Amino acid sequence: MKYSIEDLIQIMNDLRDKCPWDKKQTLKSLKSLTIEETYELIEAIDKEDYYEIKEELGDLLLHVVFYSKIASEKNHFNFDDVVESLIKKLIYRHPHIYSDVKALTWKDSYF
């Protein structure tokens, strides 16, 4: 079976509703775990272990979804808002792709 980001968001909703540990987490309680996952990703990159890179990227994606869920419970923002904000930032930072501005070198295109 192939899963989607919507499945991940639904699983996070289920975990926040039904799992005592997940229910208890806050933005602050997840910080050290996020740092740990980031270091694990860096180690996997240093080893060029693509399987581990994939796994650690998944762990970080889980954290993005987790933080978004916690924020949505407090009516601040949700995962879709995070995606929209990122897309707007990428478009803004790449006018040489999304407008008439021309970048002559890679340095011209680096925000």
Model-predicted regions and their roles:
Residues 1-56, 62-111:
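Flexible "arm" and connector segments at domain edges
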